[in-house]
Amino acid sequence: MTHDRDARCPMCGGADASLRYRITRFEVLDCRACTLVYLWPQPSPEEIRAMFATLYTTGEGSVPELRDYYGYCYEDAPSNPLVQLYERWLDALERVREPGRLLDIGCGTGLFLAVARRRGWQPFGIDDCAEATQHAREHFKLDVRGGDFGDFASQGHRFEAITGWDIIEHSRAPVELLGAMRRCLALGGVVGLSTPNQRSILDAVAGLLYRASGGRITKPLEKFYIEQHFLYFTPETLAQALGRAGLAVAELRRELTDLGRLTLSPATRLGLRALFGVARLTGLENRIFAVARAANGAQMG
């Protein structure tokens, strides 16, 4: 794998970072200026595109537990836990903005857009994965195209809502991504985001094992810090990124991964359920969900 040489923080550009963990393929760094946690070295843009070209057919290959995770992206049924999650996220969007034109960046198979359409949204999607976008068009009959959001954002389209579920952690330039999302908002529009929470029970336990072993026990960390995720946000750093992009938080909450979507041994599932119980009590849930809108005075496109 080739890597860019510049180790500056992807959010603030700071060059001063401390080492949090050193694991098999990369280091986990803390920016001393803005506190963003990020991986180093990071893959090149070409390698990033290759990673996601077959994501929905192969999953995130370095994590066997995600083998079946993407299978839930194909079935629009009330019993599907992913559909239930999307309904909750749409509830949050609709508390801030009534349905209108909706763009889902990284829309994948189109399941979220199909759920949104039933609720009165006018859906549109964009994704780099050709197999997924084909499914969205043929199975869900959605207006979805392949390609890069950066190119799309310059074409003057406007939406009442723009969503990016689990995309910001894949970005090498998160503030620029969020700024482009803001510029594509119609007046009064909203942005919806989800991403892993770096300050989670998973990092806490894996980090404890790493430090107690003098850095020799890294396997638990390698389940959490994976090469497809370049950035790891906390609620505070995600709010900071939104603010740097001219967006103001309307709602931000912590959530837990649905273990039913993961491929786990019975013992691992039981252990994670216990950890997630602790997470609920301590505020160390492993996911972040946010809704934001253009800050006062921030210019939209």
Where are these regions (language model features)?
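Conserved N-terminal segment of class I S-adenosyl-L-methionine
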Residues: 1-165, 174-180, 236, 254-263, ...
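Structured helix-beta-strand junction loops
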Residues: 119, 139, 187-188, 245
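S-adenosyl-L-methionine-dependent methyltransferase catalytic module, highlighting the catalytic core
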Residues: 159, 172-184, 190-296
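Catalytic acidic motif of RecA-like/P-loop NTPases
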Residues: 169
